[in-house]
């Protein structure tokens, strides 16, 4: 089964002869609207930004296409996290344009940007949970603020916790969770409302390899089964290996599995952007990155 055939994640595990869930219309997330696929999910056009006279970003241009994961690599201070803050409208560029879902947000006020942020899920390095709230209350926080009826809130919270394989922890407090579990709760909270764009800011930093792998698998599920567009900021090459060499499918038993066959399928929807001193020094596939002769890239690859 290809990633196209498995574009929807089944709740009940029943698969038709065509390989699609019998309840595709009731997927974990909404079905894909193809009418706007030609419009990039995110686009930077010659973006420049300075802090204290130093250019943090220098004429930065790139696109994240629909359903694509853009993996941004680079050392500390190269502008990776600044890029995410600009997408969220937390910072404004000195020059250039930033478009989200085809909408120019460059000069949006705090009020104007709010409807754009609702389209975006944000996953922080530490999960950013409220320690005084239970897992249920953390994931439900946005829904409670919006006044959603409690029955609907519970259904949505359980749906998201099932997606990250943590429904059993619904009544636990953050202090009872491991670091990896906290990150997964943070992912569940970010996915409430079915955002079609997700930002990952160093989501595996400080985690052991098996737990980091779990976080990458969740990113792959979003990319391959839910058609989510994302930016995945990292400095860890293991993340690159997972995201660029495997893809998620639903097997005949209705389980999500990760395949290595047909690697080219993954390379189409996972692209690498390497930054240095606020500029793009590489954009392409992971295979091309490993063949690059640039001394900085080679040193980065050897050090990771």
What annotation goes with each model-predicted range?
Residues 88:
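Helix-to-loop junction immediately C-terminal to a conserved catalytic motif
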């Amino acid at each position: 089964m290809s990633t196209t055939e498995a574009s929807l994640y089944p709740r009940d595990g029943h698969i038709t002869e065509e390989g699609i869930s019998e309840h595709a219309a009731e997927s974990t997330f909404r079905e894909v609207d193809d009418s706007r696929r030609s419009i990039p999910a995110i686009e930077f056009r010659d973006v420049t930004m300075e802090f204290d006279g130093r250019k943090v970003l220098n004429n930065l241009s790139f696109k994240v296409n629909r359903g694509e994961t853009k993996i941004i690599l680079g050392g500390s201070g190269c502008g990776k996290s600044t890029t995410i803050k600009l997408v969220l409208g937390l910072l404004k560029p000195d020059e250039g344009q930033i478009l989200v879902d085809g909408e120019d947000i460059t000069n949006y006020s705090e009020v104007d940007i709010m409807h754009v942020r609702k389209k975006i899920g944000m996953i922080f390095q530490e999960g950013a949970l409220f320690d005084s709230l239970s897992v249920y209350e953390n994931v439900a926080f946005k829904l409670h603020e919006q006044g959603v009826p409690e029955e609907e809130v519970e259904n949505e919270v359980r749906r998201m916790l099932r997606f990250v394989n943590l429904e059993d922890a619904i009544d636990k407090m953050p202090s009872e969770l491991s670091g990896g579990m906290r990150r997964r709760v943070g992912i569940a909270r970010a996915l409430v409302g079915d955002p079609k764009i997700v930002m990952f800011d160093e989501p595996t930093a400080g985690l052991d390899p098996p737990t980091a792998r779990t976080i990458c698998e969740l990113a792959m599920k979003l990319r391959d089964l839910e058609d989510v567009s994302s930016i995945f900021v990292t400095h860890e090459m293991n993340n690159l290996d997972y995201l660029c060499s495997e893809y998620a499918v639903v097997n005949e038993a209705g389980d999500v599995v990760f395949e290595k066959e047909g690697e080219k399928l993954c390379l189409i929807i996972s692209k690498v952007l390497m930054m240095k001193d606020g500029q793009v020094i590489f954009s392409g596939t992971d295979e091309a990155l490993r063949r690059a002769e640039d001394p900085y890239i080679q040193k980065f690859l050897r050090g990771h």
